[in-house]
Amino acid sequence: MSTKYIFVTGGGTSSMGKGIVAASLGRLLKNRGLKVTVQKFDPYLNIDPGTMSPYQHGEVFVTDDGAETDLDLGHYERFIDINLNKYSNVTSGKVYSEILRKERKGEYLGATVQMVPHVTNMLKEKIKRAATTTDADIIITEVGGTVGDMESLPFIEALRQMKAEVGADNVMYIHTVPILHLRAAGELKTKIAQNATKTLREYGIQANMLVLRSEVPITTEMRDKIAMFCDVAPEAVIQSLDVEHLYQIPLNLQAQNMDQIVCDHLKLDAPKADMAEWSAMVDHVMNLKKKVKIALVGKYVELPDAYISVTEALKHAGYASDAEVDINWVNANDVTDENVAELVGDAAGIIVPGGFGQRGTEGKIAAIKYARENDVPMLGICLGMQLTAVEFARNVLGLEGAHSFELDPETKYPVIDIMRDQVDVEDMGGTLRLGLYPAKLKNGSRAKAAYNDAEVVQRRHRHRYEFNNKYREDFEKAGFVFSGVSPDNRLVEIVELSGKKFFVACQYHPELQSRPNRPEELYTEFIRVAVENSK
């Protein structure tokens, strides 16, 4: 079977939920027995989002092979339950950088390097590479931003050329557009959707399907009007309404025959998607019997997307305990030893996620200290693990001023130090310890029990600093347990305190591998204990 290509674009405005549409369609097609992969095109000039502020971009999602990517890849993985790779996120910066390297090497044989054909050819190559490296039957490529944006023009042109290159039966264009709801007048306006589709047509692409983003349902008459003006079959005008839970969306799209229309267009003979298990999960999620409050102490809490995988992993873990997770967003900058009880005291558990830089670290340390002294279940992630060690060094070992070398190069007690292979690294982007690495678990530890007594777990990392082994013996003598280490025993992966309800921190990012129907084990145990703690 020829590889099938589905392209998801957006018009009218950004943040239309294209990623969720792509992920939901991917789930439906996977449940038809098809092998699906998904890819995100980001037209910005950064090589990747690794050095971008979370306030600009939200979370950086890390793949197994160590690519720092757009947060939409997290949606793809969680919805479809697949592991993506470095070919699943392509930026203008990455493409232009590669083209310029080739030009300097003389690989273009003296040609004038241009947007067409050189940039567009490379973009088409990236699409095909993502499909071939995963042996996918179908690749869904989402283009970030809005059709008509200056920076996205080469991407749209590459998508246009794909139809001629691989055949009309192997390509489908899905355009996501807004329907404006004027609440005061009680009216729905379609002009933005019509103009957005017209703009796409001006670039040579006729949409085969429209996905309408709306707060309220549209009428059949309005659907037919949009279909006529946009030259799309009425049945291929799909509504994506606001929902209570994101995981309802695949079911809503299936109810409108979206996946069948896609299969018919691409001439795919695939059985109907069996969504019974997914439907049961959604029904469970919407009828949780308990509630648990978790304090998330972070420095980017003004933008929840900065912690989207963390919050989703907490929710997934809640599903396993039949509990809705109520997140109390606590700005680490506001936390002190004096007010920490007031800010997190009513939470059944505390999570301290990752981050970079000095700002907010003392607040995180205060929250960790509060959890340790008051036996509140606590989970630390990445920087959260490093600051767990700093807090213990200061307040249990008496090492006044102990810190991470990253945050205080003058500290007398650098309990967190730079990794040996990072000492001479000068570039900031793409040089961290990234991707999947194993952790060997300690017998009898809380971590090993959480991971069902596994000997080794593999989880994704994103860090440059590590626990300083010079202090390991002193920590162990004081009761600090190193419950997960690298197979060569050099890198500390998990730490914990015994005798506590749950006091565990890990260097890796377990949330990146959590799924709604398969929650990550460390998160699951944390929430299970927190639910018990809230009784």
Curated annotation (Swiss-Prot):
The lineage of its organism: Bacteria, Bacillati, Bacillota, Bacilli, Lactobacillales. This is CTP synthase. Pfam families: CTP_synth_N, GATase. It catalyses: UTP + L-glutamine + ATP + H2O = CTP + L-glutamate + ADP + phosphate + 2 H(+); L-glutamine + H2O = L-glutamate + NH4(+); UTP + NH4(+) + ATP = CTP + ADP + phosphate + 2 H(+). Disruption phenotype: Cells lacking this gene require cytidine for growth, proving that in L.lactis, the pyrG product is the only enzyme responsible for the amination of UTP to CTP. The active site is at C382 (nucleophile), H509, E511. CDD domains: CTPS_N, GATase1_CTP_Synthase. Residues 293-535 form the Glutamine amidotransferase type-1 domain. NCBIfam families: PRK05380.1 (NF003792), PyrG (TIGR00337). Mg(2+) binds at D72, E142. L-glutamine binds at Y55, G355, L383, G384, M385, Q386, E406, R464. It is an enzyme of class 6 (ligase). GO terms for molecular function: ATP binding; CTP synthase activity; glutaminase activity; identical protein binding; metal ion binding. One of its GO terms (biological process) is 'de novo' CTP biosynthetic process. Pathway: Pyrimidine metabolism; CTP biosynthesis via de novo pathway; CTP from UDP: step 2/2. InterPro entries: Class_I_gatase-like, CTP_synthase, CTP_synthase_N, GATASE, GATase1_CTP_Synthase, P-loop_NTPase. Its EC number is 6.3.4.2. CTP binds at S14, D149, M150, E151, K189, T190, K191, I192, A193, Q194, K225. Catalyzes the ATP-dependent amination of UTP to CTP with either L-glutamine or ammonia as the source of nitrogen. Is essential for the synthesis of CTP de novo. Contrary to other bacterial CTP synthases, the lactococcal enzyme is also able to convert dUTP to dCTP, but this reaction may not play a significant physiological role. Regulates intracellular CTP levels through interactions with the four ribonucleotide triphosphates.
